[in-house]
């Protein structure tokens, strides 16, 4: 039982030790630095988008293409091919369509990224609460073990509950580590598609 208590504490402490590497973002659980939004200048070196930024939604074909290109289930090489085919068929409207397409991608992927970041921070807060609860229950278990006479049924029930909560905590921790990669993947997709759009405009 002492081994269980030590193992639980080790798992909880390891799961929360890396939290809040940047004091500006106390709920950010990832080792990667938190970048709340993608900067347009970091992913687009083409002509200014000011006049088209809010107009891409008015074009049904472009809106549908943006949705397909933004979906993570669409492989990047397929997305790049779709961009080339769309712009090749745009003829005299190529520059205007290219700008609308990128404006749509920028808006959509930035919004996706914000949802992922907000979700990660929500889970991080839940993990902190779970870690606090597990610590409390571990101390309660230690106290029960020191009481004479021992209430073995109560000790076993609390031990089983701790094992269950620790397993959930560990599973969430693994998911968070995986999801921490998603904002970077979105950045890379936007940069790659922006580069293809700019190349097709030239």
Language-model region placement:
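N-terminal Sec/ER secretory leader and immediately downstream segment
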Residues: 19-94
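Alpha-helical oligomerization segments
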Residues: 153-202
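Short, charge-rich amphipathic alpha-helices with coiled-coil/heptad character
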Residues: 88-117
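Non-transmembrane amphipathic alpha-helical segments
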Residues: 116, 123, 127-145
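Bacterial N-terminal signal peptides
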Residues: 5-15
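Short E/K-rich amphipathic alpha-helical oligomerization segments
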Residues: 136-164
């Amino acid at each position: 039982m002492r081994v269980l208590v030590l193992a639980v504490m080790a798992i909880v402490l390891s799961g929360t030790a890396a939290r809040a590497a940047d004091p500006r973002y106390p709920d950010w659980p990832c080792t990667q630095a938190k970048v709340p939004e993608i900067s347009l200048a970091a992913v687009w070196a083409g002509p200014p988008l000011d006049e088209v930024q809010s107009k891409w939604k008015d074009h049904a074909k472009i809106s549908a293409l943006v949705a397909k290109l933004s979906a993570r289930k669409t492989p990047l090489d397929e997305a790049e091919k779709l961009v080339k085919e769309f712009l090749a068929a745009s003829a005299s409207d190529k520059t205007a369509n290219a700008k609308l397409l990128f404006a749509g991608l920028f808006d959509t992927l930035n919004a996706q990224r914000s949802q992922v970041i907000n979700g990660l921070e929500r889970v991080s807060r839940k993990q902190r609460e779970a870690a606090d609860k597990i610590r409390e229950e571990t101390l309660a278990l230690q106290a029960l073990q020191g009481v004479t006479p021992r209430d073995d049924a109560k000790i076993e029930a609390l031990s089983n509950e701790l094992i269950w909560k620790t397993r959930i905590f560990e599973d969430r921790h693994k998911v968070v580590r995986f999801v921490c990669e998603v904002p970077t993947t979105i950045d890379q997709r936007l940069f790659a598609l922006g580069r293809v759009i700019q190349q097709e405009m030239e």
